[in-house]
Amino acid sequence: FNTANDPRRARVTLRMLLTHTSGLAGDLSMGGPWGLDRADKAEGIRRALGTPLAFDPGAVFHYSDIGFIILGALLEKITGEPEDVYVQRNVFAPLDMSDTRYLPAAKACGQHRTIGTAIAFAADAPRVDECPSGTWSTDLLARIAPTAHDEDTAGANPDFGRLLRGTVHDPTARRMGGVAGSAGVFSTVRDLGLYAQALLDRLADRPSRFPLMPSTLELMTTPQQPGHTPAQLEAANNAARQALANTPDATNPLLAPHYPAIPGQDLRGLGWDIDTALSRPRGMLFPIGSFGQGGFTGTTLWIDPGSDTYVVVLANVIHQRGGPPVVPLSGEIAPQPARALGRYGS
């Protein structure tokens, strides 16, 4: 983890990785053809561990896929299992998330062909009556929304220009074989609803099969960035209420004026977003203290324990490049259930 011999590396903690305050840059170097002809997870991890720090550890919030690639590698090291196997056994299966999984090309079964590290349906390939345990059936491809045409490295990528469907869009995760701590999961609204409700039930100490203790979820869903204090959440909500009161048109799609509510005060739980520049999917009515996460392809999940509510938006907004961004759409959707609940304004 310290190939650059940077003494600051010794100050990086798991808390910093989980709150995106480690000082790592956002994305891996994609230089060279690694992982294009065939997946190379080891090279992705090597690059993640050797990436120079862009900021001092603990100094600023900077969303980093690299940090979560490292966390995924740590999970595999500690458990001795591939990440997709571990998560399937400990999260997806117990919550009955039958339509949720990683789709690594190496474990595809059925009528398909592999092009580099991408999957494509092939009607002329032999049919498979029953897929072995540990694989996934390419019959799923018909149910998966396409994301975008593969734009990764013209001339070196055999899949370049082809439509990605059932292959993770994130190029780093794709080069690593479709399973990384930063990306790779496919799901449905139903399954994400099961996940969110189980999480809410566990937080509220109701019967739940969610695989974490309430005390652990408390760390994930309250501010945990370096230097956090209990007063930050109250101050952020006060600032958001004041901003909303000063907004002439509360239905404006630009929503509240500030994300985060207090400029320079980014609030992150362990993994979850609470109040940062990425929090627009929260909308203008759910309080700061609700939490969620967005995805580049047009996916968001936002959860509000105070009202026992969750909002799921799944869109393939980058299917046509240059289309409208999904973040404003998610932010417009979230206030609708908040208003309907009658708890958070009109």
Q: Positions of the model-derived regions?
A:
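Acyl-group handling in specialized metabolite and lipid biosynthesis
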Residues: 1
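Short, surface-exposed loop or secondary-structure junction motifs
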Residues: 4-288
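Structured C-terminal helix/loop/strand segments within mature extracytoplasmic catalytic/sensor domains
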Residues: 289-346
